[in-house]
Amino acid sequence: EDLMVAVIEKGAEVGAHILSGAVIEPGPLDELLPGWKDQPPPVCVPVEGDQIYYLKKNGRFRLPTPPQQKNHGNYIVSLGAMCGWLAGHAEAAGVDIFPGFAAAGIRYTDDGAVGGVIIGDMGVDIHGNPKDTYMQGIEIHAPVTVLAEGCRGHLSKELISKFELDRDSDPQTYGIGIKELWKVAPGKATPGRVQHTVGWPLDRAIYGGSFIYHMEDDQVAIGFVCGLDYADPDFSPFEAFQQFKHHPLIKPLLEGGEIISSGARTITEGGYQSLPRVEMPGAILVGDAAGTLNVPKIKGTHQAMRSGMLAAEHLAETSKPAGFDERLRASPVMAELHKVRNIRPGFHKGLWKGFFTAAIETITAGKLKRTLPQHADHSQLQRASGFEQPDRQWVERDLAPRDRLASVYFATTAHDEDQPVHLQILDPEVCTTRCSIEFNNPCTRFCPAQVYEMVEDVDGPRLQINAANCVHCKTCDIKDPYQ
């Protein structure tokens, strides 16, 4: 019996909401589409060399490339374009794709199982009233729903909680990745070059680093990832990224160029010990919705693809979710996560101890019996009154964008100012009382799009939500200390 497969895509087209610029391992693609290199995706550059540096404010030194970050045989791609390219292959195989529709809720059957998704109402104003363009949402019924909505998706979050899928796993931990695609001056990009840095502008207590992927046509994808388990309530990941761009190693590459696009998205960093159960009545989780990203490799695309392919094989054979969790955990996806399971939590005690742990785990291929624990990111934030600010030695900036609002201009997300506010605070009074005193309103700094802003009214300070700025990175949902 043939299965009907439908993909619900919230972007106007497949790939529209994907942050482009990534290095992929081609193994799963080789299995899925043998001969794909004869007709590759629109942007596909073989990696020609790796560089990794430790940065100080005005200096640097080259580090040996760890085995996990050696990219010989891998490809630099535009991930958005690659997703669109894959969509064409899927449609040719009979998959129905519906772009421009966001799954707003889960449809449950009478016995409490997942029975599909609910597409939200469209054409509603900020007060919830229908406009001329109103279209009522619809229910999509399905015997099995595959959640592939990425990191901290709101439907996946609901299901993980409802079915207690994380009951036997550690708390998930995350990073915030901010990325820009630049058109640099002719001759500055070296197609195929992959660069990573650690160190400045981060202090040694904050996990993170950068990536620069050199593509063709004078384009480079440049980005910065910060672990969201940081303690400093005044830290701004966006500012750290902009500071990094002004390092003497990086700034000459960007001077004379221009930003093409930008965006931000959280990534799952918990790995092996934070992976929830990935099956439930009527549904399964794949990719970053489950948390399959390999942090030491700084890669998740091949893991997401492999988990999706396993899901397809499983459902083609059984037509039901039961057994998929066992299948995933017995697969190369889980084996890859197990080998590196202690590297990310090894950095909880700082950069140098993290490097030492990473070296031990790499040498032993993760065969030591220990498994280091993960902690919920929001629990790691310290009170403002008791936190001693480090001297970050940050510099004056002159590269674009000038601030977070200017960065939002280049993002691929767009909102109607009159649409319903999708960000809701359960108790706004906490923001102006407890949070102001205890944490100095960290949301005004950890948000990369300046969605949250403390303003003075006649009645005193209040938190203003600039929802139209939102780039849907999910940082606020993760780092809010009160949850």
Placement of each model-derived feature along the sequence:
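Short FAD-binding loop at a beta-strand-to-alpha-helix junction that anchors the flavin cofactor
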Residues: 216-218, 277-296, 448-453
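Predominantly flavin-linked oxidoreductase catalytic cores and closely associated redox partners
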Residues: 2, 10, 80, 84-85, ...
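Ferredoxin-type iron-sulfur electron-transfer modules and their immediate structural context
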Residues: 41-56, 331-458, 479-483
